[in-house]
Every structure is written in C-alpha cells, then in structure tokens.
C-alpha cells in the first residue's frame, strides 16, 4: 500500500447495508473514478449487521483507482434519537423539550462513540454528548 498515492478522501454518511449507486454515493465516487458497484457491495457486506444506522464512512481513493474505506460509529445525534425513540430533535431547542436523557444513557452513548471522538477521558465524552442533547432540545438529568 505504501507505493500507492492517495488522490482523494471522500467522507459520506450512509445507512448501514443500504449503499446504492444513487446520489450522493454515485456522483461522489464516479468523480473520483472508483468502481461504484464494487464499493456498494463491499460496504453493504461490511455493514449488514448494522441495518438502518447512519454510518460515517471515509473512503480513501488511490492513484490506480482502488479504494479502502473506514466506517465509524453513528453520529451522537443519531444515537440519542435511537436511545429515546425520537424521529427528530426540537425545532426550538431552548423552549420546546422533546425528551429526557438519563446519565446511564449518556454514559452508554459516550462509551460507544469515544473511539471516534478526540478525547481521552470518559467525562469529556459525556460532556460532548450532553451538549449535543441540549442542542437537540433534550434535557439531561
């Protein structure tokens, strides 16, 4: 791999197991000259155990048009919505509260997301989760 030159990094958010050549995936990969169906098949195979989760993926495209990709944990907002069974956050987060997140839920989300965050301490990750929850109109106990 060291002799291949990286020509592009593509960052997308794709539902697990549901990659297809339609926008936004097709145009982003097509512009880089990547085999779109090859990526879709590999991504779907790698994420078939996480259906429906919105997964950030970083695709590295090399000069010979090959690629590698790394999937990350879902965004904190998606994890919060999943924990509280919400469709979306509040449209007016300072006035309308749409749910309440317990400290146990905050800790579980922070532990799950910690490897993708640039933090060392669990407390720092918990504060980031709490901030995201507040910006979505969710109270934190």
UniProtKB/Swiss-Prot annotation:
GO cellular component terms attached to this protein's record: cytosolic large ribosomal subunit
Gene3D superfamilies on file: Ribosomal protein L11, C-terminal domain, Ribosomal protein L11/L12, N-terminal domain
Recorded GO MF terms: large ribosomal subunit rRNA binding; structural constituent of ribosome
Post-translational modifications: One or more lysine residues are methylated.
InterPro entries from the UniProt entry: Ribosomal_uL11, Ribosomal_uL11_bac-typ, Ribosomal_uL11_C, Ribosomal_uL11_C_sf, Ribosomal_uL11_CS, Ribosomal_uL11_N, Ribosomal_uL11_N_sf
CDD domains registered for this protein in UniProt: Ribosomal_L11
A UniProt-annotated Pfam family: Ribosomal_L11
Keyword Mitochondrion: no
Family indicated by similarity: Belongs to the universal ribosomal protein uL11 family.
Name under which the protein is recorded: Large ribosomal subunit protein uL11
Species of origin: Chlamydia felis (strain Fe/C-56)
